Amino acid sequence: MPTCTRPAADFTPEQLRFPAIPGYTVRADFTGGELSSDLGAAILGAVDRRIGMIDRFTAAITDFRDVRYITHSLRDLLTQRIFQIACGYEDGNDANALRRDPMFKLAAARAPLATDNLLACGATQSRMENALRRSDLYRMAEALVLQFIAGYRSAPASITLDLDHTADTTHGQQELSFYNHHYGSYCYLPLLVFEASTGALVTAVLRPGKRPTGAENAMIMKRVLRLLRQHWPRTHILLRGDGHFSNPELMQLILDDGNADFIFGLTGNAVLARRAEGLMKNARGHLALHQAMHAQKRGPAVQAVRLFGEFEYAAKSWSQAHRVVFKAEVLASACRQTGGSNGAPNQPKSGG
């Protein structure tokens, strides 16, 4: 019986090339050998060698160790810890196993297959983290802002900064971990700042799990704005955030900048409810009309009516009045409104 055979083709495995480290060229192929499930660490290392984020963090921290007894440099410790977290290994004791991983060693610019150059163990990582002082953390937050600025070739005409306090649930006896009723757990409540159009991280500030005060918000953002203004004096800056940020201290800071504005959530109160009641009556009337027309088969069913309005408002603690935009919303289910039982409109927004 005749058979048909095809000549074997020459085959070269496709390779991935990475930036070299001293004394080594770095390539990845798929022919076996020493294995690792964390190629991402090597990719992160290659990216960092281009942008220099770990170098910024290293320069921000004061290392008080005696140089005669240092096995792992501060830069190596930060590289190992940060990349472990990025790859999903949050626990410090994960370092006990990953210190031998060739990809994590490669990320730290160490020979990946050597057996005499292990990375730091979990105990060393723990000592490093506990040695950090408040001033180190402050300078690391500054380093993030400088990294954000370095991502631009020239000063942008305008940027929008989104401010957000995000719950980070804690377990055990972590320092400054507090119970937060809103989130229903013990947590930290770090402040994260992102640039809205690109999603780029501007900075992150670790803080206790309690609700921030206006003075604290202003203190943090004063430092962020100062760094931005040193590099971008003419850039218009818009800050956005929820009701955590509608504090007189932060609002005044933004007004004093001269080329910045804000859009913040505003907690409802009796004064705002009275100012919005006229629009709420209109919303109820619109819904009643739609329901009547639907009952007569003269129109579609309407589940909600939403109307928007605005007015000038000044709380006693504010230095001036600001424009408040609010939503009056009435739902068809039980003809109830959202936002609370006191008749207040839903989530008014204040702007400067």
Language-model regions: role of each:
Residues 166-168, 207-209, 244-246, 267-271:
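Active-site beta-loop-alpha junctions enriched in small/polar residues
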Residues 1-212, 216-231, 256:
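Dynamic "connector" segments at or just before major functional cores
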Residues 172, 247-252, 273-277:
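A short acidic (Asp/Glu
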Residues 160, 236-238, 261:
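Hydrophobic "anchor" residues on beta-strands that sit immediately upstream
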Residues 164, 235-246:
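Acidic/histidine-rich, metal-coordinating catalytic segments
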Residues 251-260:
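Short, surface-exposed basic-aromatic patches at helix termini and helix-loop junctions that form
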Residues 2-3, 12-26, 263-352:
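An anionic, glycine-rich sequence signature occurring as long contiguous blocks
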